[in-house]
């Protein structure tokens, strides 16, 4: 029977061979962490390679995602549908083994990692979801939600600020099922880290309230195993500090940055094989090694045992069992569509001139009563973002049965934690901050879009309408940057009806994130027919039309729709034929068929004006070079909002005069 070291060496061999064949990649971390991975995956990780979606599996996250050959090797050896040919195709076009682990490619990859610090933060979200789902569904004698979240991370993850945001909150919330392994190898791309990373990491994590196990020999299986056992027994999140040698097994490059991010080279790989006693050719794993690694039988037995537990739970609590299945499968409640549409119709029939942030809260109130899977939150701005509703109950370390997370001032951490919650399953996460501060969180929203996971962000205080707080808090280019992100759905509604439609579609959207952008100031509700209400979902629609063919089209979003309508009324009174198009979601409009887009924006009507209190340049796509844009070309100013709108040209007079110049 192969020794544990020999089993770990299988990871080392596959990792150095995969990087060498691709002629790019990072062999150092996989070779350094192979012993830890062998102990965790063969001795502790509850998973089933034949069903990577098993609801109560342990989650494993490789936060130092550049070491991707580590997880690819583990998945292959354990029996997942990842062949040796897939490993040979490492970093190649359309392979299941891209340079950094990507969710949705290889089975068993729980999240896309690579931007350092986000993996550990996703893992915090997964651990929060596990604890909340357990609190909501487990009954005495029936622990149907009971799994750990394990994460590997390196020095780079800990240097990134997001690791502070996430790990601080994890300690506060007592996430005892979260176990992190710090790959303390002292090396980063630039060399030995003591010149730029001299933190006392164990004390840092003790200060967060974590259980810290220091100075574990990362190449000693017994020490690693003992640390994991101690971690599992402690009610706090655990940091296991593993001292490792980067590139372990490479005689001439281990312990240095030379093996961090480049192939070892054929000569050094041969030397490593000799040093490790690994006598097999590249990509060849002997049968006895495969046999020891294969987790399919054990995984199937573990899942079968859980299925029996769930059957007993379902017999005792049939309603809860059905609800658990619905939520884990990501299905919306029965009659959702009918009830949601009625809510929207009622809003149209009962006009209210309110801020769209208040309209958002009203939508939460209406929809939330149907959605126990809601998991809300805000980055310490709940009274401003209006993200709490009557059914909101805050999560606390001692009581995780609620549905609202106080993230504190942690925009980046919040957004990446929400990605983890969404990836775990069982919840529809929403979070919030001022639109300006989405900048802190932009990369986590990009990751949500890349992974195609549901992440609903409420961004309030959406323009110079914020007023006196000034340009540090007034967004200008942020809406455009969200719209330009692939697979991001971005909504800027003009009233309570568009706001409710935006919320409904964000709740229904399972294949990507949604940015819902709301105003601080009150907005007038617009009259609409039932057909117009239905057309809101198309992202752009005719709100007010001319008698006969229009000679001018005004396109507006959010708070500027009311302005466009008033300007159109004045122009119409002067004999102009003016159409007003409300375009709350350009991405949704762009997805409509050509016939619909042409019906809203006829190509032969070139006199067009776009009006939005955001960066002007975005709108040339819709108005053309012959059109005009009333938008922002500079940062804002500190002053009352009404003065700012006048100063920057968001007035009926300016729209009317611009229209007359265009039509002259």
From Swiss-Prot:
GO terms for cellular component: cytosol. The active site is at 411 (proton donor). The record marks 26, 260 as: Important for catalytic activity. Its cofactor is Mg(2+); Ca(2+); Mn(2+); Co(2+). Gene3D superfamilies: 3.40.50.920, 3.40.50.970. SUPFAM superfamilies: Thiamin diphosphate-binding fold (THDP-binding) (SSF52518), TK C-terminal domain-like (SSF52922). It comes from Vibrio vulnificus (strain YJ016). This is Transketolase 1. Keywords: Calcium, Magnesium, Metal-binding, Thiamine pyrophosphate, Transferase. GO terms for biological process: pentose-phosphate shunt. Catalyzes the transfer of a two-carbon ketol group from a ketose donor to an aldose acceptor, via a covalent intermediate with the cofactor thiamine pyrophosphate. Homodimer. Its EC number is 2.2.1.1.
